[in-house]
Design a protein with these regions (language model features):
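C-terminal transmembrane helix end/exit motif
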Residues: 162-166, 182, 186-216, 417-465, ...
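Membrane-interface junctions at transmembrane-helix termini in multi-pass inner-membrane proteins
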Residues: 126-147, 358-387
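Specific pore-lining/lateral-gate transmembrane helices of multi-pass inner-membrane transport
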Residues: 65-81, 268-355, 361
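N-terminal membrane topogenesis motif
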Residues: 1-18, 215-241, 504-531
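Short membrane-interface helical motifs at transmembrane helix boundaries
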Residues: 90-110, 327-345
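Membrane-interface helix-loop junctions in multi-pass transport and translocation proteins
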Residues: 142, 153-194, 198, 380, ...
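Signature of the first transmembrane helix
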Residues: 1-58, 85, 96, 233-254
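Membrane-proximal transmembrane or re-entrant/amphipathic helices at the cytosolic face
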Residues: 257, 459-531
Length: 531
């Protein structure tokens, strides 16, 4: 089971990287306005993705684990399939037939065809949910993991192919956006084929338990209620950041236009604002990776009531997440203009993005807390915090966008995440910092400030001869150089002030090699002193 959980975590990690990276070439191909078109509708895809991958399949797998030893599950799964089919068909019909209304709520009627394009993926949802839940419920995680990675690879390929047609086959960015969103259903079909391939060697006949459940005893109402409450909660908790983006889709562009801004300028500014999402995703990669790798360890220690080990793992996860999210944020802030130019071709929106990327820290810590609560089955805390955080984000957008435009949306995002993180901390019985935690924060502050001084100092020096925004090639080379310097400074500083324990170093990729290297380095230094 542990190995299976790690396989799923690795697949999720790979999918996160793919999901963050493809947006850069896509934006380069279609520009700010094309990126705006795609990002306006992306949250709908993101919600559908959580339905088919990390929300309902987890619910189905839990249902299988609960009933497998007592009943034949085929009738149960059939009813679940029909309920999910009704849900998927309902969402599809709403999105497809009401696409013009939804587009008008977003403030851009031309988005209608893009919304219709993404709606088709919901018809594939029942197949993916039942198949993934089936395999996960029988502790076979490889089919789900492979289907997830293949789904992302196919989707990214179709999106970039669609973007490549801009300027040759069409000059209509909304048409490109429609093609790009069709990647969702193409990828879902591919994922279904992958799952069917694994299903070939299996049979539902093996699912018979000690007795056969009678169809009338599988109550439709009970299944529907559990699917909505338990499955719906899992879906909401798996789409935290996507829901924040959905609020921006309905309020930011529309809010800018209502303030008297032309639609073309508003689209351009929204496209620049949306650059923050891949930056935040990349900044969160390490933190999310730790959350994924710690989750099975936390679940195992809590289930076996090894509470001391659980507390150690909990503290270690929060510490590692805080360290890497803070370092990533500080590093990005120091060299943001060069990174902006390197990735997106210009240095527009640095002020907006500099606020937005602070969410790397808040979102990473929030996901870490969510992982801890998930391992103990305390979903209600995160759900309450999420709802309050979304309300804060929505009110923040309505309040700040008229005053500060896209900068206001960035501020509202930070506000919403901060409120949510604070609510999670309070509701989970937040305690005052121990001396050990204070020591960690002091050490983290020293390392972060030291890194910022070294990297920032070099950047100021380079700015005299190679101003940011002057040459994309130079900014790319300098950004990569400064990132490398920052990593080296962080590693040396972390080792010198003993920021991590040996066990924590071993949890870091290549951490064991780093420890060996530093030990050899210390021994050589001692020999030189003796001489």
């Amino acid at each position: 089971m542990m190995q299976g959980a790690l396989v799923l975590s690795l697949a999720a990690f790979i999918a996160k990287i793919l999901s963050a990276v493809y947006r850069v070439p896509f934006q380069n191909m279609v520009g700010n306005t094309g990126f705006y078109v795609y990002q306006q509708v992306y949250p709908i895809y993101g919600i559908g993705m959580t339905f088919a991958l990390s929300g309902f399949p987890v619910f189905v797998s839990a249902l299988i684990a609960q009933y497998r030893s007592d009943y034949e599950l085929l009738p149960l799964l059939k009813r679940l399939f029909w309920i999910l089919s009704g849900l998927g068909l309902g969402v599809f019909l709403i999105l497809y037939t009401q696409s013009e209304l939804i587009a008008s709520w977003m403030g851009d009627a031309l988005l209608s065809s893009v919304i219709q394009s993404v709606s088709w993926m919901f018809l594939m949802m029942p197949f993916l949910v039942i198949a993934r839940g089936y395999f996960q419920g029988t502790n076979r995680m490889v089919p789900t993991a492979v289907s997830q990675v293949m789904e992302q690879v196919v989707r990214v390929s179709v999106i970039l192919l669609a973007a490549s047609f801009y300027g040759s086959l069409t000059n209509d960015l909304y048409e490109v956006g429609t093609w790009a969103m069709s990647s969702a259903v193409v990828a879902a079909v591919m994922a279904t084929f992958v799952l069917l391939y694994y299903k070939k060697s299996d049979s539902f006949e093996n699912w018979n338990g000690s007795r056969v459940i009678e169809p009338h005893k599988i109550q439709w109402g009970v299944l529907l209620k559990r699917l909505v409450i338990e499955g719906g909660t899992l879906c909401l908790l798996s789409s935290i950041l996507v829901l924040f983006q959905l609020i921006d889709s309905f309020t930011l562009f529309k809010g800018l236009v209502e303030q008297g801004m032309s639609q073309e300028v508003a689209k351009d500014l929204k496209g620049i604002f949306d650059r923050g999402q891949p930056l935040v995703q990349l900044g969160m990669v390490v933190g999310v990776g730790f959350s994924s790798s710690y989750l099975p360890l936390l679940s195992r220690s809590y289930t076996k009531q090894h509470l001391e080990e659980f507390e150690q793992l909990k503290y270690s996860l929060l510490k590692m997440t805080m360290v890497f999210s803070v370092v990533a944020t500080v590093g990005l802030l120091v060299i943001l203009p060069r990174v902006n130019h390197m990735l997106f071709g210009d240095i527009q929106g640095n002020d907006v993005l500099s606020i937005y990327i602070i969410s790397i820290i808040l979102a990473s810590m929030m996901m870490a807390y969510h992982g801890i609560l998930q391992s103990t089955g305390k979903y209600s805390i995160t759900l309450i915090a999420l709802l309050i955080g979304l309300i804060a984000k929505g009110i923040g957008n309505l309040w700040f966008i008229p005053q500060f435009q896209t900068l206001g949306a960035s501020i509202a995002t930070i506000l919403g995440l901060f409120v949510m993180l604070g609510m999670i901390w309070i509701l989970s019985g937040g305690k005052s910092s121990s001396n050990h935690q204070k020591s960690t924060m002091i050490k983290l502050g020293i390392v972060s400030i030291g890194m910022a001084i070294v990297v920032g100092g070099l950047n100021i020096l380079f700015e005299r001869y190679f101003p940011a925004g002057d040459s994309r090639t130079k900014d790319t080379l300098l950004a990569l150089l400064l990132v490398s310097v920052g990593i080296i400074v962080f590693i040396i500083g972390a080792i010198r002030i003993k920021l991590f324990t040996i066990r924590e170093w071993l949890m870091i990729p290549k951490g064991k090699s780093l420890l060996r290297f530093t030990r050899k380095w210390k021994k050589r230094g001692e020999k030189d002193e003796i001489r």
